[in-house]
Amino acid sequence: MNKPDVAKVAGEYERILVEFFELSAGLAPRFDLILLGMGNDGHTASLFPGTEVLNERTRLVAAPWVEKLNGYRFTMTLPVLNNAATVVFLVCGEEKSGILKEVLEGPPDQYPAQAIKPATGQLTWLIDRAAASKLKS
């Protein structure tokens, strides 16, 4: 899919969200629950480190180019994710233990997963023992 096509598809997905949630201009939908995972690089949804989509504040849906994947990825943007009533991260496996420690105990604002901060909602991390193995507590 080329850039004009992905922009069109992202725009259509956004239009559907606006229509379904009966949104006024500039408002983000409020999902009851959003389930997220986290990649070994600290990405979540399709919000990857170093991509411009992390700075998006007006669009609800974007299709950023992800260099390491050599392709576009569709994602809801931070205004949508952070407007949810509840966001739950599911993180499993020893291979995630290092990045989980960095995300939860390291400096803030280093990884996309750290940008998930529901404005008026709840954030929950569900992690297994292997993923938690490097955490302090």
Predicted regions and their residues:
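Conserved phosphate- and dinucleotide-binding cores of soluble alpha/beta proteins
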Residues: 2-137
